[in-house]
Structure formats: C-alpha cells, structure tokens
Amino acid sequence: MATNLALQLQVIEPDTDLSSIMIGNSRYSDDVWDLRPFITAKTTNESHKYIRFEYISDADMKETVKQYAYYKLGKMKPQTVRNYINSYLPMFIEYYSINGIHSFEDVTLEDYLNFNLWMKDEKKVATGTGNNSCHVVEEIIRIGFHQPR
C-alpha cells in the first residue's frame, strides 16, 4: 500500500510539550510538516508531501489550524489533509486577515456568508473550490478547535 489511510498519532494532553510531538520528519511546532515518511507513492508531487502553515500570520489561527490538521491526520490520508490546509484554507485566512478576524470563535454566520460571496464575486472561484473551502472552515468551527485568547 502506498499510503496509510490515517496515522497513529500521539494523544495531545493539556500538559503535552508540543515541541516533543513528531509528525513525519517534523515537530508539531514547525511551520512546515514533512509527511514524506507517510506518502510513499512515486507519483505524488514532492511539494504535496508537506503541510505548510507559514501563510497563517496570526498565532492563534495558526495553532487552531495545526490542531485541526493533527486531528485530521489521525482520520484520513495525509494527502487529503495537505489539500485541506494548503489548497482550501488559504482563501479563508486571506479573507479573515483582510477583515480583522483573528479567531475561529469570532466568525459569525454573517461573516461566513460574506466569505462565500467574496469567493464568488471577488476571487471568481469555481463552485467546487468554494464548496471545499467552506467545508474545511465549517468543520474547524464545528469541531471546535479554538485557542483561548
């Protein structure tokens, strides 16, 4: 089998030192997670074997996205998680940076609907791309990975 469906990851407790948790060749605290040990398919583009978090400048948002990515790595294929974080989420992060929102807890229904309109009217994204972006955002909010301020 070329890829694990989900990874067996260490459970994070409130007192866990996050810098001690390894994800592939990376530490949880790194801004790039190297997933090459888990993605062995020769046909996978090299750049698709990494989850990149550098595009998220807000520390609380970045931590929430990392928690979500870590959780999802235990549930689905690493490539899918990489797509969620590096293909579908950047538009959301851009929109909320522009609008001064720094926590998933602060996202209102009106904000969410305006994000949808912004993707359609300003970014001119395809319906499928917009749906995928909204799915990831909605899931992060629903699951409830929020950092206290």
Please state what every model-predicted region is.
Residues M1-R149:
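Charge-rich, intrinsically disordered N-terminal extensions
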